[in-house]
């Protein structure tokens, strides 16, 4: 795989070494087609900080990107229906603190002492042929104290993204289920005819709005 082709693969794809040439070609075709979806993407809502989750609620899809010129970056456009779950995680970075002894040498405390910083990560689990999850750091800079204002804000953003994607996914699935449900004949309150409401919930005879 040449460097130029490697750059075109999804940033969320991590199975390159275990993929066949044909699988790589399929993904490159998908990434090329994705450019059209990016071009037509209309942001209706923005969540997150430096790494943003952009929602196109009209087209029922979303993008995760940290690029300010995200259209040029060709981020993967995912459908709300592809989301299978979301979960957040707090990761700790422990850096040992040392002291200087009487001889001027650095040594550990007994017991050892650590400076602990925190990062909040969100993982969006997705149903895609090319990757299973999208993981990114929610906070823009490392958090020094747990339960600080910065920590709570990162947790709030993670929860907001999770709740938004989960809710939108359920709405899409409910709409699909409703569309597949068998239609039931009803009596039109306007003309009295027995009718099967059309896709807009209107009587097929008089056009009256009778709902679905």
Language-model features: locations:
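Netrin-like (NTR/C345C) domain of secreted extracellular proteins
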Residues: 4, 13-21, 170-181
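Conserved beta-hairpin
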Residues: 39-82
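Alpha-helical interface/anchor segments and their boundary "cap" residues
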Residues: 17-37
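Short Cys/His-rich "knuckle" micro-motifs
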Residues: 1, 12-16, 90, 197-202
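Short Cys/His-rich micro-motifs in 6-15 aa windows
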Residues: 4-16, 206-212
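Short, flexible, mixed-charge glycine/proline-rich loop motifs
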Residues: 174-185, 192-198, 210-211
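Acidic, Ser/Thr- and proline-rich intrinsically disordered linker/docking segments
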Residues: 84-183
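Short cysteine-rich clusters marking metal-coordination/redox-active sites
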Residues: 2-5, 188-191, 203-206
């Amino acid at each position: 795989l040449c460097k130029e082709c490697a750059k075109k693969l999804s940033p969320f794809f991590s199975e390159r070494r275990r993929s066949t040439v044909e699988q790589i070609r399929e993904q490159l075709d998908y990434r090329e087609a994705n450019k059209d979806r990016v071009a037509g993407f209309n942001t209706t809502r923005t969540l997150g900080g430096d790494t943003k989750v952009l929602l196109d609620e009209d087209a029922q899809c979303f993008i995760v990107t940290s690029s300010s010129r995200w259209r040029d970056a060709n981020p993967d456009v995912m459908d709300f229906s592809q989301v299978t779950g979301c979960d957040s995680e707090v990761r700790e970075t422990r850096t040992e603190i040392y002291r200087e002894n009487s001889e001027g040498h650095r040594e550990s405390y007994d017991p050892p002492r650590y400076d602990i910083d925190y990062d909040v990560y969100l993982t969006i689990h997705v149903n895609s042929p090319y990757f299973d999850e999208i993981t990114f750091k929610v906070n823009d800079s490392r958090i020094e104290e747990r339960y600080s204002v910065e920590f709570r804000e990162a947790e709030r953003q993670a929860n907001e993204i999770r709740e938004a994607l989960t809710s939108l996914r359920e709405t899409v699935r409910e709409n699909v289920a409703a569309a597949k449900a068998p239609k039931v004949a009803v009596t039109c309150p306007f003309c009295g005819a027995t009718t099967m409401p059309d896709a807009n919930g209107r009587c097929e005879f008089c056009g009256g709005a009778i709902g679905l």
